[in-house]
């Protein structure tokens, strides 16, 4: 916990480096001088922290040495006690082992603290090296102040830098808001385009469906038209046949009426005409049959007469 706290404190005490790109030499000089002041303050704080920790480590080391001496004396007394009383040897050995473990643990702590001390010494040397490197920035800032007519004090440079930083922050915030607005408009445009694309797709599907239905209706209409034409053709054929039958029936009726000995009145109904024709044909058939029978009878009589 002490090491983590020290590291955090060191991180907080380190100077914050600003980006010096695209700024004037006077601003860079001011920034470098500010960094130099912060480095010096951080180094001084680390020196004080290092001295304080070194003193704490020394006190701990002395305390551990005293504890080690006390432990050795306790071991000596414990050995004498074992020689005087064997019945308590088991318990004494356990206590001795515990004390040995504690001594070993303390020795490990001493080693760890020694390593921390060495690390702090190395950190001190590194900070001194950084401080020595940063001194050139201090000299540079001083040289800039010597040649700059506009800024005579470091505070003026700091104020100018703060103004430029605030302006830069405002411009970045404005740019961010414009980017957010553009992204919002772009998103809304994408949503609108998607909605209209979906609507167009649905309308195209409906048009395709209606077109398919129209083609079906047209095909059905063509079928019905073909049926109608066929029906009209059949009706015309039948009408023609009916007219031919009526004319034939009327012609035959007139011929039968002219040859019949019965005075049939004139008929225009084809059915009545067919009845008359049927009767006439039936009578004619009977007459022909009777005539043939009489001829056969006569022929038979003639044959008999010749034989006799």
Curated annotation (Swiss-Prot):
Q: Which UniProt keywords apply?
A: Cell projection, Cilium, Coiled coil, Cytoplasm, Cytoskeleton, Flagellum
**What InterPro entries does the entry give?**
CFAP_domain-containing (IPR051147), DUF4200 (IPR025252)
What effect does gene inactivation have here? The mia2 mutants do not express the protein in the axoneme and display slightly jerky, slow swimming phenotypes, reduced flagellar beat frequencies and defective phototaxis.
Q: Which BP terms from GO are recorded?
A: cell motility; cilium movement; inner dynein arm assembly
Q: Which GO terms describe its cellular component?
A: axonemal doublet microtubule; motile cilium
Which GO molecular-function terms appear in the entry? dynein complex binding
Q: Where in the cell is it found?
A: Cytoplasm, Cytoskeleton, Flagellum axoneme
Coiled-coil stretches: 103-134, 164-227
Q: What is its main location?
A: cytoplasm
Q: What does this protein do?
A: As part of MIA, a complex associated with the outer doublet microtubules of the axoneme, may play a role in ciliary/flagellar motility by regulating the assembly and the activity of inner dynein arm.
The protein here is known as Cilia- and flagella-associated protein 73
What is the source species? Chlamydomonas reinhardtii
């Amino acid at each position: 916990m002490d090491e983590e706290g020290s590291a955090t404190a060191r991180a907080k005490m380190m100077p914050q480096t600003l980006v010096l790109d695209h700024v004037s030499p006077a601003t860079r000089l001011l920034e470098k001088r500010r960094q130099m002041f912060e480095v010096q303050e951080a180094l001084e704080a680390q020196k004080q922290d290092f001295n304080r920790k070194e003193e704490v480590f020394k006190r701990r080391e002395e305390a551990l040495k005293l504890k080690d001496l006390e432990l050795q004396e306790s071991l000596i007394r414990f050995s004498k006690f074992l020689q005087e009383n064997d019945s308590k040897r088991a318990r004494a050995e356990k206590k001795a082992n515990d004390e040995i473990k504690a001594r070993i643990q303390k020795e490990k702590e001493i080693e760890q603290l020694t390593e921390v001390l060495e690390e702090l010494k190395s950190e001190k040397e590194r900070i001194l090296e950084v401080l020595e490197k940063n001194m050139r920035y201090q000299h540079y800032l001083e040289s800039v102040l010597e040649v700059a007519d506009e800024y005579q004090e470091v505070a003026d440079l700091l104020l100018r830098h703060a103004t430029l930083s605030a302006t830069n922050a405002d411009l970045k915030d404005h740019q961010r808001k414009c980017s957010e607005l553009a992204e919002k408009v772009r998103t809304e445009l994408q949503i609108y385009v998607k909605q209209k694309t979906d609507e167009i797709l649905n309308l195209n599907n409906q048009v395709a469906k209606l077109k398919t239905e129209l083609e079906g209706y047209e095909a059905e209409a063509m079928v019905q038209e073909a049926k109608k034409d066929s029906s009209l053709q059949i009706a015309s054929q039948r009408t023609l046949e009916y007219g031919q039958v009526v004319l034939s029936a009327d012609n035959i009726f007139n011929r039968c009426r002219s040859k019949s000995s019965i005075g049939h009145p004139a008929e225009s109904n084809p059915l009545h005409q067919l009845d008359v024709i049927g009767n006439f044909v039936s009578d004619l058939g009977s007459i022909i049959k009777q005539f043939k029978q009489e001829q056969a009878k006569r022929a038979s009589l003639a044959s008999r007469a010749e034989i006799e």
